[in-house]
Amino acid sequence: MTIMRKKHPLLKMINHSFIDLPTPSNISSWWNFGSLLGMCLMIQILTGLFLAMHYTSDTTTAFSSVAHICRDVNYGWLIRYLHANGASMFFICLFIHVGRGIYYGSYMLLETWNIGIVLLLTTMATAFVGYVLPWGQMSFWGATVITNLLSAIPYXGNTLVEWIWGGFSVDKATLTRFFAFHFILPFIITALVLVHLLFLHETGSNNPSGLDSNSDKIPFHPYYTIKDLLGALILLMVLMILVLFFPDVLGDPDNYTPANPLNTPAHIKPEWYFLFAYAILRSIPNKLGGVLALILSILILATLPLLNSSKQHGLIYRPITQALYWIFVANLLTXTWIGGQPVEXPFTLIGXIASXLXFXIIIIFMPIASTIXNNIPXLH
């Protein structure tokens, strides 16, 4: 008699995805972040659900409802800070996951990579609308500034902005619809994750060597379930240290002041995980140009498979491209720092250099390095 998990239609799908899945035997800890992202998503949906039970999406009561959650709801403070810091952990895992994809050439699995880019954009949209909900100063002004960017679109821009606002400024209608978006988007993300996994399991995972691993596969369970469990425990430990000891370290103090349309904060800035994109946006003096650069800073990931001319898969045996990769990472960290600084010299100059370098490394330098690497054997 065959085992139930191999026969039952539903269990069979789970079995092929998480139990008997043939997995390369040499994938390193950098491959843990996919499962960690799944865990982050579950934490965010669960904590978000409980927050939504007590939150009111009305301009007059939104701020006080968040205060009420923290003060009066049983473990409300824990749920709220798990949700806020869970988002930060989500983005840390996302950036590492994408970085690993670039380093090891996983972008050559085209469908998986493109769905991944859509997932990244959807998660960023979810985080943005979620940041508006507590209705603090930075929520309000962040929403005003970022939605206002759409007015840079020629001809239809201003109409589009007023349509999204539901009026002539960020107000009650905006908050209500942002809450609706913030509620529905994580479920859309979950559906996209399933498609992401579907495409991944069509081809099988990439591995650190960049070679075909069909000759050396092991079952996912118990080897990688145990390995993922260790990653999950480390992530939970870091998250709980953040939540219990430093809950506000990644937040903005301005968000403890209720939203006031008549008083602009000294420095309007988004959450830390958007600062690199914000720096790119600010580094271009033209409004439309800035918006395009902001969008392209994420969409540039889609050009990686097109620009790849290397004969090798991944950067593991390509020292020149490796050096460029780490310069690119350092450059993004620099831009993250610049995005949080005021708009004055020398920060504006550093921001502009970092922005230009980020695009140049991917579009110009990496393809050149690949060509050099391809021709090195010919030089001997």
UniProtKB/Swiss-Prot annotation:
This is Cytochrome b. GO terms for molecular function: metal ion binding; ubiquinol-cytochrome-c reductase activity. Heme b b566 binds at H97, H196. It is found in: Mitochondrion inner membrane. The chain crosses the membrane at residues 33-53, 77-98, 113-133, 178-198, 226-246, 288-308, 320-340, 347-367. Keywords: Electron transport, Heme, Iron, Membrane, Metal-binding, Mitochondrion, Mitochondrion inner membrane, Respiratory chain, Transmembrane, Transmembrane helix, Transport, Ubiquinone. InterPro entries: Cyt_b/b6_C, Cyt_b/b6_C_sf, Cyt_b/b6_N, Cytb/b6-like_sf, Cytochrome_b, Cytochrome_b_C_euk/bac, Cytochrome_b_N_euk/bac, Di-haem_cyt_TM. A ubiquinone binds at H201. Heme b b562 binds at H83, H182. GO terms for cellular component: mitochondrial inner membrane; respiratory chain complex III. One of its GO terms (biological process) is mitochondrial electron transport, ubiquinol to cytochrome c. It is a multi-pass membrane protein. Its cofactor is heme b. Binds 2 heme b groups non-covalently.
